[in-house]
């Protein structure tokens, strides 16, 4: 009974008391005044400069890495005249490039084009073979390459005999001493003594053997005369033989006569 009395006391006594439970206006106005005003469009608030730089978190500023562009290789005059360029082509062509000759024209042309293609691929791999040849042909009209081309052609030309003698004379004059090579020394003698007479040159030597050797060197026909004087021909040998080759000498006749006289005297005494 007492419990029932307490339950009855907890129940609201009137509808006015029940309406007080839904009365939420007592502190809401104060709470709305304390909260900051938010933007109406719903965008977040801008962070301060300290937050943007990240210094508040102990972080450095953002570093922007810009990738450097590598220079593009070009097929120009400097690349052609460098060691991997035309100088390498000239060296390897002398050692490795061989042609079969007449009757093998097509195979020789194919071998030459293949040789050029391998060289151009090593020199400038970016370009195709036809494009590389067009670039090289255009660069060949420059003054620098034309001068180098003329110099290379002059190097491959065979030298004349006079130029070789001049080189020998220059080398002997620069050395300042007599060369040990007899060919070089003899060539220098002929070139240096062209303006002198043969008698003056032969007179510089005291002995007859040296004079004879110099005269033979200056006059090649003298060697033939010298040989004729040293060696006799068959005709000369026959001409020099005496006619009375089988007849004995006078001394032999006297000896024979004395022997005959002695024989006669011995026979007479017997």
From Swiss-Prot:
Protein name: Chromosome segregation in meiosis protein 3
Region (Disordered): 1-20
Key words, A-Z: Cell cycle, DNA damage, DNA repair, DNA replication inhibitor, Meiosis, Nucleus
GO BP terms in the entry: DNA repair; DNA replication checkpoint signaling; meiotic cell cycle; replication fork arrest; replication fork processing
GO cellular component: replication fork protection complex
Keyword Nucleus: yes
Coiled coil stretches, renumbered: none
Primary location group: nucleus
Superkingdom: Eukaryota
Localization (cell): Nucleus
GO molecular function: DNA binding
Chain intervals with Basic and acidic residues compositional bias: 8-20
């Amino acid at each position: 009974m007492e419990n029932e009395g307490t339950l009855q006391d907890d129940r609201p006594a009137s509808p006015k008391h029940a309406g007080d439970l839904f009365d939420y206006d007592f502190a809401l106005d104060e709470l709305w005044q304390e909260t900051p005003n938010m933007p109406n469009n719903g965008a977040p608030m801008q962070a301060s400069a300290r937050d943007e730089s990240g210094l508040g978190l102990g972080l450095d500023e953002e570093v922007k890495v810009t990738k450097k562009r590598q220079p593009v290789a070009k097929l120009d005059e400097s690349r052609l005249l460098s060691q991997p360029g035309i100088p390498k082509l000239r060296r390897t062509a002398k050692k490795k490039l061989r042609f079969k000759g007449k009757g093998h024209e097509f195979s020789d042309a194919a071998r030459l084009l293949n040789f050029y293609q391998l060289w151009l691929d090593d020199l400038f791999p970016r370009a195709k073979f036809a494009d590389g040849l067009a670039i090289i042909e255009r660069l060949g009209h420059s003054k620098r390459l034309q001068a180098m081309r003329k110099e290379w052609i002059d190097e491959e030309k065979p030298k004349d005999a006079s130029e070789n003698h001049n080189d020998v004379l220059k080398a002997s004059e620069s050395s300042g001493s007599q060369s040990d090579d007899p060919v070089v020394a003899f060539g220098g003698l002929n070139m240096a003594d062209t303006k002198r007479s043969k008698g003056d040159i032969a007179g510089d030597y005291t002995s007859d053997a040296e004079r004879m050797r110099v005269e033979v060197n200056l006059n090649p026909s003298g060697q033939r005369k010298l040989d004729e004087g040293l060696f006799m021909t068959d005709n000369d040998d026959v001409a020099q033989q005496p006619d009375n080759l089988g007849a004995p000498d006078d001394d032999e006749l006297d000896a024979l006569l004395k022997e005959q006289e002695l024989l006669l005297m011995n026979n007479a005494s017997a």
